[in-house]
């Protein structure tokens, strides 16, 4: 709403879901269609996009897995130095047989648009409720003095808990009163299930060189798993803070 209220009312503001591997988008904007807040406008031309549940059943107006059911013009034939297409198969075809699984947690809408809730392999599970990280970030990053945040699951006592890491503005302390503000905002805007077990302040949040938060790397760090490739991370030095502070919960 900010852009339309403060900058310009008749601008096309939209997002996408796609990727480098397909040199394209599965869902994207269209200047001939209306724009609805929080939604990507439509499927891309030539893309047989759908939302599947975990059993491979197509669902509507419910959260699930973004897939492409048919071949498309820019579908990669193979990855470089990937003998027998092992990496390609593991990346996109392991979950559903012969159907491209894009690993976006998404929902189709009554407007024929799409909502992306985050990467499906980084979604959180709280008491059996699946939570997309993007919906949590939208609430937390709208709180005054929060610059950005990231949430991941940590294994704990044969279960998992949600850790929320927040980067705050300079000279702002994450004290008990601020933690309560964050939890209350999450509860009122989302649900009690969305409230993390721990809220932890960090100096910086690790990102790729293209600016994407590396949720899966952070998840591995807090679960004491081996990280094999740090070359794509622009600020790997901040990972150690995540490792140290996350161990407080164990």
Segment roles from a protein language model:
Residues 13, 49, 149-151, 198-199:
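Generic structural signal for residues in well-ordered beta-strands
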Residues 43-46, 242-250:
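Acidic, glycine/GT-rich loop-and beta-edge segments that sit at the periphery of enzyme/chaperone cores
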Residues 11-12, 162, 195-198:
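Residue-level recognition of the N-termini of beta-strands and the immediately preceding loop/turn
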Residues 1-113, 120-123, 136, 142:
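Conserved AMP-binding/adenylate-forming
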Residues 16, 52, 152-154, 202:
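Conserved beta-strand termini and adjacent loop/short-helix elements that scaffold enzyme active sites
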